Amino acid sequence: VGVTFFIMPVSVMFPLMTLDHFSGDAFGMSLVEMLWAGGTLLGGAVMGMRGYKVNKVLLINAMYIVIGVCLMLSGLLSSGMFAVFCAFTAVTGVAGAVYNSSFIAVVQSNVDPAVLGRVLSVFFSLSLMPSAIGLLGTGFLAENVGITTTFVLAGVAIMAIGFGSFALPSMKSLDSS
């Protein structure tokens, strides 16, 4: 839920980043959205191809760090580096899909199948509540400190959650892969 607080609000700002910081146009906005979606499809396909023998909780934490690094570096790019922004966007899409598929697998392996649907429903409903607050805060932040700084701050926060999660042994024990 904590990561969603930062990812969801920043994800809606990719078109604004394209227009304002990179002086892009409708094609650039479409390209960025397409790369995010393509990265998500690629990440989902890679995760769905076979079962990986890796601790999925560690994978989730690593993907937090990858997403955070990509967002932070996106905010540090000069206005002439749109192609690099596009690459970071695609990587963020891949990492998001790996995170989501790993998260679902961890939940499925730890929750009784009789209540799994309700647990996922409650989780996703609860995770959207802080996202709404994050959207309000991110809009205010972007208006007052700039969109690039907002990307940097969100990236740093997401990385901190990823690194912090590695420090919790109880998290690692949620998956025995």
Set out the residue ranges of the language-model regions.
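Pair of pore-lining "gating" transmembrane helices in MFS-fold secondary transporters
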Residues: 1-9, 90
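C-terminal transmembrane bundle of multi-pass solute transporters/carriers
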Residues: 14-177
